[in-house]
Structures are given as structure tokens and as C-alpha cells.
Amino acid sequence: AQYYADLRDPRFAVSFAVYHRRFSTNTLPRWPLAQPMRLLGHNGEINTLLGNLNWAKASEAGLEDVWGEAAADLIPVVNPDFSDSANLDATLELMVRSGRSITDSLITLVPEAFRNQPDLDSRPDVTAMYEFNAGIQEPWDGPALLVFADGKRVGATLDRNGLRPARWCTTADGFVIMGSETGVVDLSGKTVVEKGRLGPGQMVAVDLERG
């Protein structure tokens, strides 16, 4: 924080913050690939990346239906020279800028395991939503813990493999903290009212506009 003058200014205040630090495991470190990206911070790998890139490339022709002539400025949406995280971020941003909420977009891109899922037997509407989304978007499968923010919502979601740690808590004075481990934020003097961990396919999100 000492490097950035705005962060040292006592007048500087925000309603949320996303912080990510991780060694690159499958690409060479480069500033354009530094995280968090425009909408995402990603801990993990996308093991379906090749199929996802091919699907995205094949779908580019449909961009004109939403964006008209401006679609030419968006192509290519994905780039095989970029990291898996950067390509997922670009795909998510396209969906969000096209009018879908960031939470709905992530549920589509990174769905939970909904087939033969006993917990969803009483929620046919949820199963129907996932089945509909599966027809228009192939899943980006991890292992992946994704932290997201678009200025309207901030949160985190775990892919259906559930192989990345994600712990959260809320405090009596209104803070919501989520991290890959406890202790990321000093909670000395604060009263924790609820805490837990994300399971496979689960999401925690805060609506910054409505509270």
C-alpha cells in the first residue's frame, strides 16, 4: 500500500476490496496477466481450457445479434496466448457488458454439479435453469476459486470440483470477509456472527447497491 499514493490518503474510502497474490503455475508472469483482473481473481486452473477456447471462437459469429457493428471491436474475445484466468475473465466481462448480472453469468460459466443431485430434488426450477444454461454455454471446469466484483456485487464462488479452500465470515458491524484461509483480515475487537466455508458449486455474494 505504501507504493500507491491514493491508498495512503486518509480520505480514500471504498465499500469493498479484492486482493489476490499467487504464483503463476502454467504461464510466465507478465503484467497484463496480473490479478485481480477486470472482474475476477482466480485461484486454480481451468482444465477444460482448450474446449472452452474453441467454443468461444465458434460462438463469435453470434455477437452481432447483441452488439451489432460494434461486435467487430470485441473479436477475438479469447486469446490462446493469454492465461486461463485472463480468458475466463474476458468471457465473463463480455456476458456482463451484454446485460447479464455477474452472479448469473458465473452460474452459467461455472455451474454446480446439478445432475443427479439429491439436494436439488426439491428445486426443479434450479435444475431447469442449469439445464437451459448448459445448452448455451459449456462449463469452465477447474479446480477454481473465483473472487469477483463489478462495482454492483462482490463475492466468491467455488467450482463444482470444490478443490480450493474458501472461508468466509460476517461481523456484527457489517463486514463480510472471504479468503482462502482465515486470518487474512485482522478481526481483533470485532464480533463474528457467522462463519463457514464454500462447498462445491457454492457462492457467497454481497449486493453493494442494496446492502
Indicate residue ranges for each PLM-predicted region.
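Conserved short alpha-helical segments that host acidic/polar catalytic motifs at enzyme active sites
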Residues: 1-211
